[in-house]
Amino acid sequence: MSKLILTRHGQSIWNAENRFTGWVDVDLSEKGKEEAKKSGELISELNIKIDISYTSYLKRAIETLTIILKTLNLSMKFNTAWELNERHYGSLTGLNKEETKKKIGEEQFKKYRRSWDVAPPLMAKDSNYLENFSPLNDGIPKNKIPFTESLKPVSYTHLTLPTNDR
């Protein structure tokens, strides 16, 4: 029987700082690297075989998968798909979540985070964070690069996964 394993990347340095990350390409924290290793150990303990793997373009996800595969003693190519990139948080990108909640209020904060079709405000076209996205944007159709996202477009984007072996 086939099995589907879904893993989230390990803790990133911005997760540790409680910041909205989205498409900003930040590294894993040491804790995140350990979490990835533990995921690999659990997969091994459960004797689950991996035949194919996918990850987003984000280095924290690629590093998580690489650590898992290394822990499993697997040296296999994996597929990258920008469609698996984390949700884009628009103008909230880089902000501390607790400070943002205090500033905009609990209700609006929840809408931006959990609402199906309410996206945070657009990221400004002159945002410093846009430079961080440029390497990620290679191979992504320009009309598909978001400046913010609600959960709705993210869930639809994840339904189709082209392959790009690494």
Labelled PLM ranges:
Residues D25, K142-P153:
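Glycine-rich phosphate-binding "P-loop"
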Residues M1-L4:
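Extreme N-terminal starter segment of soluble prokaryotic enzymes
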Residues T157-T163:
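Conserved small/polar residues in nucleotide/adenosyl-binding loops
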Residues G22-K37:
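Short catalytic helix/loop segments, enriched in acidic residues and glycine
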Residues G32-A36, S53, T100, V154-Y156:
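Conserved anionic group-binding/transfer micro-motifs
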Residues S39-F147, L161:
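Phosphate-coordination/substrate-recognition cap region in phosphate-metabolizing enzymes
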Residues Q11-V26:
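Glycine-rich N-terminal loop/short-helix segment of MobA-like nucleotidyltransferase
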